[in-house]
UniProtKB/Swiss-Prot annotation:
The keyword Iron applies. Keywords: Autoinducer synthesis, Iron, Lyase, Metal-binding, Quorum sensing. GO terms for molecular function: iron ion binding; S-ribosylhomocysteine lyase activity. Fe cation binds at H57, H61, C124. Gene3D superfamilies: S-ribosylhomocysteinase (LuxS) (3.30.1360.80). The gene is luxS. Belongs to the LuxS family. This is S-ribosylhomocysteine lyase. It catalyses: S-(5-deoxy-D-ribos-5-yl)-L-homocysteine = (S)-4,5-dihydroxypentane-2,3-dione + L-homocysteine.
Length: 155
């Protein structure tokens, strides 16, 4: 990583982090003063493990729908292409500990979900690729290690 790249995560040494963790990956201030806070919510150790797509896809649907029951500050929940985590973005919400609480509460909701929201061909671009049980297992595993979420580099 000799030169700084435009994408923040490309400047992160993925060999140094220790999943699971939640880190503030960046902030942006809009022309009217609104602030976006983007969090790297890392479920799996980069280059060692990944989430299987049906479970990841269902967890994305569940988190996107359920998190909005706990905050009106959520902008988006986006899966990482590497399948190791998600980006979670908030607007005008700088409280890291509260962001962690929203994530935890949302994942707790996932554990008791009875269906994946919008899991049909009308509302989803790949409705055949879902696993409610897989999503629940990912949520349970991540929640079990909540004490590690603030420790990005395993120190």
């Amino acid at each position: 990583m000799a030169e700084k790249m435009n994408v923040e995560s490309f400047n992160l040494d993925h060999t140094k982090v220790k999943a699971p963790f939640v880190r503030l990956a960046g902030t942006k201030v809009g022309v009217h003063g609104d602030e976006i806070y983007k969090y790297d919510v890392r479920f799996k150790q980069p280059n060692k493990e990944h989430m299987e797509m049906p479970a990841l896809h269902s967890l994305e649907h569940l988190m996107a729908e359920l998190a909005r029951n706990h905050t009106d500050k959520l902008v988006d929940i986006s899966p990482m292409g590497c399948q190791t985590g998600f980006y979670v973005s908030f607007i005008n919400h700088s409280d890291y500990d509260d962001a962690l609480e929203i994530i935890a509460t949302t994942l707790t909701d996932v554990l008791v979900a009875t269906e994946v929201p919008a899991c049909n061909e009308v509302q989803c671009g790949w409705a055949a690729s879902h696993s409610l049980e897989g999503a629940k297992a990912l949520a349970e595993e991540f929640l079990a290690k909540r004490s590690e979420w603030k420790n990005v580099f395993g120190e």
